[in-house]
Amino acid sequence: MIDDILEQVQNGSLTAVEAKKKLESYENLGFVKIDHHRKRRQGFPEIVFGEGKTAEQILTIVQSLRIRNDSVLVTRISLEKAVFVQNVCSDFEYNEIARTLAWVKEKPKSIGAYIAIVCAGTSDLAVAEEAAVTAETLGIPVRRIYDVGVAGLHRLLDNIDEIRSATVSVCVAGMEGALPSVLGGLVTNPIIAVPTSIGYGANFNGLSALLSMLNSCASGVSVVNIDNGFGAAYNAALIYKLVHEKEINDDEDIIF
């Protein structure tokens, strides 16, 4: 990217002032400082957490992000706020189940690999879809394998080959949170477990599932916070990029 900017300055298609603006690490908009070098430092652009922000603030942020990035993602955004943004940015797509608002400039070329999003039950879909949309917006192919919880293990076994073929799996479960441990004993790829807040009384809004996953006897299972589909998918995407870096060919300059 830096070489391209310098070349544009040299041939006159970009002024020095414009080049300086493009190379700035962040943009100060008063209420927010947008990190434009996030992708160069960490591999993916800055993601917007929608809760607690006004629709106007979200719109301002995404309009800035899309100028310098190939994708933009807002998580935990209500339908009302999403519609406000879409009235200006009509090419942004809202996923009502995941509560995400996403824009992708163009889909990356497929290399045949993928992340598996494994979900225990339909009640966990909001978290699973947040994970799936996050990975897809970051340019990572996804296979959705839903409603394969431990109450009907035959459903999981019917899909086990597809899960085994994934580079990494995100496993979402509520109630007692048993699915990641079961899956961990069946596959060789790493599993990122996501406890959800779905369950009755002693589930304690996901605490019981979280503790079950943290105490898993199965090797290869790591755990993120309750309902954090985004965090699981982000880490899965980092693993995917490391494994497939030669095929992906990401030539972004790293700037500290």
Residue ranges, per PLM feature:
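Short glycine/serine/threonine-rich phosphate/pyrophosphate-binding segments
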Residues: 56-58, 124-129, 153, 173-183, ...
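Long amphipathic alpha-helical segments
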Residues: 1-78, 87-88, 92
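Glycine-rich phosphate-binding loop
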Residues: 158-196
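Glycine-rich phosphate/diphosphate-binding loop of Rossmann-like nucleotide-binding domains
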Residues: 111-152
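Short, acidic/small-residue loops that bind anionic groups at enzyme active sites
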Residues: 93-95, 183-206, 254-256
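Glycine-rich oxoanion-binding loops at beta->alpha junctions
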Residues: 100-102, 141-162, 207-208, 224
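C-terminal binding/interaction regions
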Residues: 119, 123, 161-164, 168, ...
